[in-house]
Amino acid sequence: TVTGILLGMQQLLQNIKNGKTIVEDVPVPTPREGQALVKVSASLVSAGTERMVVEFAEKSYLGKARSRPDLVKQTLDKAKREGVMPTVQAVFNRLDQPMALGYSTAGTIVALGKNMQGFKVGQRVACAGSGYATHAEYNVVPRNLLTPLPKNVDFESAAFTTLGAIALHGFRLAEPQLGENVAIIG
């Protein structure tokens, strides 16, 4: 740091084009309105989700297309609207952008953007969201993807918050009835 300003950090990134996973030195993000900068203390590795991303990145272009027909359809629709060459360029630009891995972390707020009532610097929080709660030293997270931690919850346990929320959402969608047996797997 220089006069309290954070200059750089490390972040785990996945190269979607060639499949390589790397730890990269990147700038510390700055929180905007409605966001907090969180110093990460624990980051959860989701074996299923992150394995899927890594396996996707390691596939050939044809393999990527076969595994994501939804994206192929979006690409064809874009080509019809905007033309083939701009679409091809957009696809290669997207593949050249490294993807931040992770979506469930816990840490301490070190800076706040405007309109972050209910949160304060020094507050311990759980963070959620792909592209927000990544495997990095610091994350900028919007207020709707933050939740304060009770004093008796440690960072390692809090890093499971997102997975618990996903399981709870799935449980609610299933609408189980009183007396039914259910199993939550994954």
Sequence positions of predicted segments:
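Short N-terminal strand-loop motif that marks the start
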Residues: 4-97
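Conserved hydrophobic helix-helix packing surfaces used for dimerization/oligomerization
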Residues: 11, 181-182
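Residue-level recognition of short, solvent-exposed, well-ordered loop/turn junctions
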Residues: 32, 120-121, 142, 177
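Short, Lys/Arg- and Gly-enriched loop/turn segments at beta-strand edges
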Residues: 50, 133-140
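A glycine-/small-residue-rich N-terminal strand-loop-strand element
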Residues: 86-97, 104-130
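A glycine-rich, Thr/Ser-enriched phosphate-binding loop motif common to dinucleotide/cofactor-binding enzymes
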Residues: 101-103, 128, 135, 145, ...
